Amino acid sequence: MQEYVIELSKYFIAFFMVLYTASCFYTFRYPVGEKHRGVFILQDLLMFLVQVLCFLNLSLVSGDFQYLFFFAFILIFLFATITMVSLIYENINRLLLNNMCMLLGIGLCIVSRLSFDKAIRQYVIVLVSLIFSLLVPYLLGKIHFFKKITWLYATLGIALLSTVLILGEVTHGSKISFSLGGITFQPSEFVKILFLFFLAGALWENVSFQRVVLTAIIAGAHVVILVVSKDLGSALIFFVGFVFVVFAATRNYLYLLAGLVGGGAASYLAYQLFDHVRVRVLAWQDPWKYIDNKGYQITQSLFAIGSGSWFGMGLLKGNPTAIPYVEADFIFSSICEELGVIFGICLILICVSSFLEMMRVAVCIHDRFYQLIVYGIGIMYIFQIFLTIGGGTKFIPLTGEIGRAHV
């Protein structure tokens, strides 16, 4: 009986994910801000059903009911998040809120399957992040000097990245983090926010050629520090964010063309300068030729995705740990192996719907400063997803030093 439940749940999980994904795109039929109470209640229900079936599978297959206890805490968190945020901020974008909760729940489920201890740590980080995120909209509405400290954002960003370059720990050949009190920090993630505030502050009311050049020089300083740190994935994300925010601010296609040409030239230069970039390109071109060394990681990722087929092998029934660093940049391959390619495609579409909603929200914002920030968040968000999933599926070469899609 237990085996029947486990086997049938694979198909129900895929079915509920398809319904949830369809509901995301259904909301695009209506203007931003229009309430779709029935649709969002349906999404909440589907989110709950997907989480229940996933954690039930983990408990039944492993025989360990700690997964159900963990699910109870996740459920409390998701319910509290949706309820509290909706009550405090009545005009919250429910599609983005629901998508965030869905992706968080799935992420915690998969991480708990790979490493329960890491899942607990991630859960604590998510709780702390929720507290801060509840304050951000209030602060943005009450404090009005954010537009006036443009150069402070740039100074802090460059200082943080330089600190990591000088004092950071070397992880797989890249300097990307440092530890403080046993907790590891990756400042480039925080600097992304400062970087977008800097770009918006520099360009929201002045888009002259001189201002664009000055902004490009300072943005280039961020990128160069990341390149010297060998954090090429983050450098690429910062560069793409800069190019598209400048385009959004100026509506000048020449800047976009210049950015694309410059990006191509920088990619060629990186190929010539960094040995590990050449290794990654070789592994991308023919991973099967180097399956025992350079191509091992990507071939294992492709094996995992292929073995999952449409509906997956079932949670705890695959072998995702055969992929080095699977819990980091190859988690999508793990998801496809055990939950199926249909589930994986739905995840991608949910991310795409989030990006499209961010763009729709940006169009509706009248304050140019915040509009550019939202544009930038959307671009950097979708490009980071493109790098991670594209690297793990052999759509693009991996950009990490050793075994990381983008470090």
Stretches found by the model and what they are:
Residues 1-17:
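Hydrophobic transmembrane alpha-helical segments in integral membrane proteins
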Residues 305-342, 365:
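Long extracytoplasmic/lumenal interhelical loops at the membrane interface
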Residues 405-407:
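Conserved small/polar residues in nucleotide/adenosyl-binding loops
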